[in-house]
Amino acid sequence: MTTQTDDARLNSSEVRSSIEVAAPPERAFEVFTAGIDRWWTRSHHVQTGELKEIGVDPFVGGRMWEENDAGDVCTWGRVLAWEPPSRFAFSWLIGPDWGVPGPDSAGSRVTVTFTPVATGTRVDLVHDRLDAHGEGWESVRAGVGSDGGWPAGLRQFAAAV
């Protein structure tokens, strides 16, 4: 298992991170999407209280959502591409305040590709259009691009595969 983040990209409005997992693309895609609740960092949520569950609706236009321990459900993104087992993309509506997104929230985009390699699957994640979050967007880039952001998420994903 390897992970890397392209540090040069941290100076732009996108973040890139990748990892290789010892599983075929079909399995990697399924764990990344349907199995998101098994690997998502539990402290990474936008609502008050504890994260109870996080999920993905498996179709274009579907929700990226979370439920807290009080039963409140929040949609924080929308599925933009659903192409098993090779590509998955969603909008990221969580802005610089890291709070519950409003109905008119501007969003960035996360695209995840799953490419077969000799040892399994290479998973490449690109979180781009970060500047669409407006003033303070650099804090979103700093958060998702830090070692505790997408790189940590991908390591946890790899452990769940």
Residues covered by each model-derived region:
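Hydrophobic-ligand binding "helix-grip"
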Residues: 54-55, 65, 69-120
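A conserved amphipathic terminal alpha-helix motif
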Residues: 129-161
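Short, solvent-exposed aromatic-acidic interface loops
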Residues: 93-97, 126-133
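Hydrophobic pocket/interface hotspot
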Residues: 28-32, 64, 79, 90, ...
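Hydrophobic ligand-binding cavity/cleft-lining segments
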Residues: 1-51
